[in-house]
A protein has these predicted regions:
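Flexible, polar/low-complexity N-terminal or interdomain linker segments that lie immediately upstream
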Residues: 1-64, 144
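Residue-level detector of anion-binding/catalytic polar loops
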Residues: 52, 120, 137
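Active-site neighborhoods of enzymes that stabilize oxyanions during catalysis
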Residues: 135-144
């Protein structure tokens, strides 16, 4: 009986991991008190109302595809990118940061760095994969 339970559990976990649409088996350890986490539907509504989107992924990923209007603000080159975009960042009332998904801490780090500079920013839960999965618009290339 134990062998059947073990085999069934193993098969279920393997399917969950391989399906690409599996359930998260742990809480996102990157989320901290004070983080403003939003879902893809709310993010899209905010984009339509003029929110500034910030892509925390490495710039090469941004160039492949990003949310329309998003600025590249990669966590691994934050200071340089922040300096380049500071006037726009300081003028926004609504910023949303995203990165590569569940296992990506970059959006959380960028949002906290912005908050330290007096710029509140929400974090798109599940990031870029959630946006793509919802079939929301994307843009290719280096232009926002």
């Amino acid at each position: 009986m134990a062998a059947i339970i073990l085999a069934g559990s193993s098969l279920g976990l393997a399917w969950n991991a391989a399906s690409g649409r599996g359930l998260g088996l742990s809480r996102n350890v990157f989320i901290k008190d004070g983080d403003d986490i939003i879902q893809a539907g709310e993010a899209k509504a905010r984009l339509e109302k003029g929110a500034l989107f910030l892509d925390a992924r490495p710039e090469a990923f941004y160039r492949m595809a990003h949310i329309p209007g998003a600025l590249s603000l990669p966590e691994d080159d934050f200071d340089r990118a922040y300096e380049r975009h500071e006037p726009r960042l300081r003028s926004t009332l609504d910023a949303v940061v995203y990165c590569s998904g569940f296992g990506c801490e970059a959006s959380h780090i960028v949002a906290r760095k912005l908050k330290e500079r007096g710029i509140p920013a929400s974090i798109l839960h599940e990031g870029w994969p959630a946006w793509e999965e919802a079939h929301y618009p994307i843009r290719e290339g280096a232009e926002p």
